[in-house]
């Protein structure tokens, strides 16, 4: 690491997952920079939030950086404000906003409902019932086209880099999961709907806003976005960026989780000595049922194993104290779970 205090003045970072309430404006990596101040060791985050979005960001320190992909796979809840009657070049308020002028074929998309054209403007206005009617189409497994402003790579290059150069590209389609989608507020005058969306990993909220607007035949984009939950972790328990400091990470507490607390969504298994020795070396285990498990032995968390019931292999291994890593202690209630 370069810059900042000298290495001797930095505090070794413990293994923590920190719930941070990111404000609108900063990038997700700005939160990582804030968490790194005064520390030495690895710091990262799981699940990027765009600068225009706010809410829950999981920042990981020390060995906890190894569980990033596990946390990224958890369902996420978003509070999404959709603005109808206009489109954005980026699908959000940071892009070029243009009034939506529907063609006859596009306007027909709203024929099923009570969409109306604004007098003298040729713009379609929608009602709360119109929005409720189309939401059913966006629950369950749906297909989204990856936005051009995403980090997904096409031809070996992130799409957003092409977008910054003004280039276009054929973006891939992906199947994603929307577990629940509820309208909690509708403003007919402003032509906005506030939605609560519980989605699977890889779902783009801005695409959801655009696709709902397209289904209504009026256009739409994400006017505001706040992530409220990741798995069982809530933004209500998060800390502010200005509170990030080595003193905060010293002990688990509100918004600061140990590895065991962060991995509580995965059941735990205590291993006998023979298998604990095998697991410590990253070998296959035969005793675990099908599924994914935290495995413990010698009084510590050894790793995360996954298998079919006929054999399990490590997904993540945690270093022993002799390897210079943390030594997550075994919680008292993992046996037989």
Model-derived features: positions:
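Short, conserved beta-turn/loop elements at beta-strand boundaries and strand-helix junctions
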Residues: 140, 172, 186-189, 230
């Amino acid at each position: 690491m370069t810059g900042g205090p000298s290495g001797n003045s930095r505090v070794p970072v413990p293994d923590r997952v920190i719930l941070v309430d990111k404000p609108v404006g900063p990038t997700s990596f700005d939160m990582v920079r804030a968490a790194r101040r005064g520390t030495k060791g690895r710091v990262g985050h799981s699940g990027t939030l765009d600068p225009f979005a706010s809410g829950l960001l999981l920042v990981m320190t020390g060995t906890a950086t190894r569980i990033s992909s596990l946390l990224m796979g958890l369902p996420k809840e978003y509070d999404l404000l959709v603005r109808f009657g206009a489109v954005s070049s980026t699908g959000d308020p940071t892009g070029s906003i243009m009034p939506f002028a529907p063609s006859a074929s596009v306007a027909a998309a709203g024929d099923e409902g009570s969409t109306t054209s604004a007098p003298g403007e040729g713009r379609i206005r929608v009602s709360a019932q119109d929005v409720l009617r189309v939401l059913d189409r966006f629950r369950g497994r749906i297909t989204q086209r990856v936005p051009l402003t995403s980090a997904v790579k096409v031809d070996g290059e992130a799409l957003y880099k092409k977008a910054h150069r003004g280039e276009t590209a054929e973006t891939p389609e992906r199947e994603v999961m929307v577990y629940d989608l509820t309208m909690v507020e509708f403003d007919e005058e402003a032509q906005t709907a506030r939605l609560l969306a519980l989605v699977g990993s890889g779902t783009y909220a801005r695409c959801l806003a655009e696709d709902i607007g397209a289904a209504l035949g009026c256009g739409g984009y994400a006017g505001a976005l706040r992530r409220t939950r990741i798995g069982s972790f809530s933004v209500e328990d998060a800390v502010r960026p200005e509170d990030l400091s080595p003193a905060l990470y010293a002990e688990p507490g509100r918004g600061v989780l140990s590895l065991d607390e962060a991995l509580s969504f995965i059941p735990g298994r205590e291993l006998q000595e023979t298998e604990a020795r095998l697991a410590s070396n990253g070998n296959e285990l035969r005793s675990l049922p099908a599924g994914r498990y935290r495995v413990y032995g010698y009084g510590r968390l050894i790793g995360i194993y996954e298998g079919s019931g006929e054999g399990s292999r490590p997904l993540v291994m945690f270093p022993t104290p002799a390897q210079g890593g943390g030594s997550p202690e075994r919680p008292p209630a993992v046996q037989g779970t």
